[in-house]
Amino acid sequence: MKASMFLALAGSVLLFVVGYASESEEKEFPIELLSKIFAVDVFKGEERGCKGFGDSCTPGKNECCPNHACSNKHKWCKVYLGK
């Protein structure tokens, strides 16, 4: 059941992208669209100078971004909720 729902959703998305790209006048539009969809370089921690949620860290070095804290147990940055 889950697999069929996933395939239906993936097929719908693919149909939408192909239909939208075919209406475009530019021939390189599908390549540009796919490169923008799969561009994940925006979320890298090195560019922001601190480590975000889920990034590995060393406790006590204050490497995590504001509102995050390095977990002593798991050794990765978590959202700091305070006490």
From Swiss-Prot:
Pfam families: Toxin_12 (PF07740). Residues 22-48 form a propeptide. GO terms for molecular function: ion channel inhibitor activity; sodium channel regulator activity; toxin activity. The modification Leucine amide is found at residue 81. InterPro entries: Huwentoxin-1, Huwentoxin_CS1. It is found in: Secreted. Its main location: secreted. Expressed by the venom gland. Belongs to the neurotoxin 10 (Hwtx-1) family. 15 (Hntx-3) subfamily. Monomer. The presence of a 'disulfide through disulfide knot' structurally defines this protein as a knottin. This is Mu-theraphotoxin-Hhn2j 4. It comes from Cyriopagopus hainanus (Chinese bird spider).
